[in-house]
Curated annotation (Swiss-Prot):
Signal peptide: none annotated. Belongs to the universal ribosomal protein uS11 family. It comes from Lactobacillus acidophilus (strain ATCC 700396 / NCK56 / N2 / NCFM). This is Small ribosomal subunit protein uS11. It comes from the Bacteria.
């Protein structure tokens, strides 16, 4: 039997991108932050779960803040300076993620809400009693 071939993982190429789009997807359970170039190719991403937050802590504004900070730092290492922000979803981490992006030093040029709104599609889940 032949020994298993080691497949070398492709090294991540540092892209030098000046401006891009920060996609913030904030759900009731988690917040995902992905920073892409203008064409939509991923430059950096992070999420509350990827940073080690588990369970109900993932859905907090603080977790969203940390996720946005981590993604922004990674993008700034690759030369990112200006971002447009597109926010999707009803979660708690929307505003804190935007503030965190600004605090890390990225210049925010525009903020868009791209939350999909159904034209009376499928029935929503039952109302939350919180």
């Amino acid at each position: 039997m032949m020994p298993a071939k080691k497949t070398a993982r492709k090294r991540r190429v540092k892209k030098h991108v000046e401006s891009g789009v920060a996609h913030i997807h904030s759900t009731f359970n988690n917040t995902l932050v992905m920073i892409t170039d203008v064409q939509g190719n991923a430059v950096a991403w992070s999420s509350a779960g990827a940073l080690g937050f588990k369970g109900s802590r993932k859905s907090t504004p603080f977790a969203a803040q940390m996720a946005a900070e981590a993604a922004a730092k990674s993008a700034m290492d690759q030369g990112m300076k200006h971002v447009e922000v597109s926010v999707k979803g009803p979660g708690a981490g929307r505003e804190s993620a935007i503030r965190s992006l600004q605090a890390t030093g990225l210049e925010i040029t525009a903020i868009r809400d791209v939350t999909p709104v159904p034209h009376n599609g499928s029935r929503p889940p039952k109302r939350r009693r919180a």
